[in-house]
Amino acid sequence: MAADDIDVYGQQEALRRLYERALTTPLPNYAAPTSFELNSAGIASTETYDVIITGGGPAGLTLAVLLAHQGLRAPGAVLCVERRPHPLLAGQADGLTCRTMEMFKELGLYDEVLKVGHEVAEMVMWAELPGTKGIQRVTHQASNENMTPSRVASLVACSQGQIERILELELASYAPGTLKRGAEIIHVEMDARMDTKYPVVVSIRDESGHVTFARCRFLVGADGAHSVVRKCMGISMVGDLSDRVWGVIDFPAETDFPDIRRSGHVHSALGSVMHFPREQSADGDWLTRFYVDMDEANAGNMDSQSAQVGPLTPQHILDRISRTFHPYHLQIKPGTKVEWFSKYSVRRCIASDYIRHDFQGLPRVLLVGDACHTHSPKIGQGMNVSMADSYNLAWKLAHVLLGISSDPRSILESYASERYPVGRQLVEIDKAWNTLEWNTKITGREENYQDTRKDLLRTISGFVSGYGIQYSSGYLIRTARYLNEECSLQAGSRLQHTVMSRFADGLTVDLHDEIVPNGRWKLLVFATQYLSCQKGPFAQAVRSIFENLIPIFLPGCITPIIILPDLVSNVDNGGTSLTRSVDWAVFPSRIKCMAEMKTYVSQRAYDGYRISCHEGAVVLLRPDGVISIIDDLHATEVTSFLKTVVRTL
């Protein structure tokens, strides 16, 4: 081979590595090669995929992006089919709460969202009180009131179309060709032959009407409230349909109402309106969204069989807004127009099941987002919970497909056992909030209304932040306590953020910066102040984690993170020294060798989580950041638990 050829090859390899360094390091692939050889005429040439996602909205794209981040990037790994030829141009979902913003932070997309979104800092309620004429402000609060402190914006207005655009670009950078627009899945069936590795068969129709067939190992229905996947699998929606009619509209508002740029509710004898400040339009005008109760104006035009409502025009909605906001004036800003409007009735339903098994008992078809839960937009959780479904599911699919999971059936079934209760909680909270805030006139509210409202807002705050969601004990969660009762951490919940200083270079980071969704388990080792006593039991326990725990599992699947208190024991004089003042040599050598850039100092973490600096702890985080188990430094229970979920060597 000529020298020039070597140089060209070397340049190509260097260029490839240059681009790959900008991407998340994929999980290693331990799966046995799969083959698809069936003798049936025509079937052998059918396209096959590891995962097919039907629906390219926020839930479907989030799942595709996470799978790509975690290693499913090769052609034929994932196909996402979306009927629309482009991202949503206007309307539909518009609010992102702090857990979703944290997810974007972990994906490296937070700044992209803020660039096109609008942070909502405050919330208000206006009402027409007894004995008064016209509305007046009755509450005024920060949007993050009652919420667990977060390092990200608590509420951001950002159109669904922008979210889809951002996710689509991210997906293209990892796995180009994954998203197929202008096509839709029209039929799904499970292959009855038990020997096939691709048991799910889908029919895909393109824009011209041509139908092709594809097979996959797993199918995810992210195709919305009218899900074809759900219907083909015979999964029903259970719930109720309200006869209340609502209008929703986006436009640049011109008004003397003082709180138009705050999120709020307005109640008067003439109607009820929820207003939500939006981002700027393409023309630079600040948009506002209004949800308007049209019940009195249009109550007779309801088709109770289909959730479709009778004729409703933008002018009908605008007239109701104008009357409700009296004595303030509100109109479309001159020279602008309505950006989007729609009408809906509230259907609060949840799917009877989130998964369907194949004929060997392995979950093969899974539902996410509106395909498995529907509700009103009043607490702004549709897009947020849908994306959280995908966040829960992605790493589980990746672990099965990449041969990491030791029990594929149990890990996939945990998706339904964990997310079904969340979907039901969403429907129940939405119903309670609507009943309290929208279905009762101001004059008819009970004396304890304010106390009831505060309690419900605390529940909603915990739900939207994610800290109020608690997964029950199960295959992936061990709630038994192996640590003293003072520790505030709970298995099945999220870990609150905290600030740390990296021991190697002094860089200040947030613990959540280490909890990225790369598909790896995070082993947090709170190593005590006695780690510097290398012959002591605590240093021996930490050394054993590196020598006897991590090496028995598939390499590259568990990331150790060492957290030290501000003071460590001084073996020379029996006192203590500032951790930042000592050298690596005082700690077991395995730490610098295996976790040099994952060793941190944070007294705040010990204090905030109520972990003793004298006893330490081991906290195992799942790839989605949820606490699986909390153990003492000997990590006996952690080792036993990991053997049930991750393959050993």
From Swiss-Prot:
The keyword Flavoprotein applies. GO terms for molecular function: FAD binding; oxidoreductase activity, acting on paired donors, with incorporation or reduction of molecular oxygen, NAD(P)H as one donor, and incorporation of one atom of oxygen. Gene3D superfamilies: 3.40.30.20, D-Amino Acid Oxidase, subunit A, domain 2 (3.30.9.10), FAD/NAD(P)-binding domain (3.50.50.60). FAD binds at Q92, I185, Y344, D370, S386. Pathway: Secondary metabolite biosynthesis. Its cofactor is FAD. Disruption phenotype: Impairs the production of usterphenyllins and uscandidusins and leads to the accumulation of the terphenyllin intermediate. Keywords: FAD, Flavoprotein, NADP, Oxidoreductase. GO terms for biological process: biosynthetic process. Its EC number is 1.14.-.-. The keyword NADP applies. Homodimer. Belongs to the PheA/TfdB FAD monooxygenase family. Nonribosomal peptide synthetase that mediates the biosynthesis of usterphenyllins and uscandidusins, p-terphenyl derivatives. The pathway begin with the biosynthesis of 4-hydroxyphenylpyruvate (HPPA) from L-tyrosine, possibly by the aminotransferase ucdG. The nonribosomal peptide synthetase ucdA then condenses two HPPA units to produce atromentin. This is Flavin-dependent oxygenase ucdD.
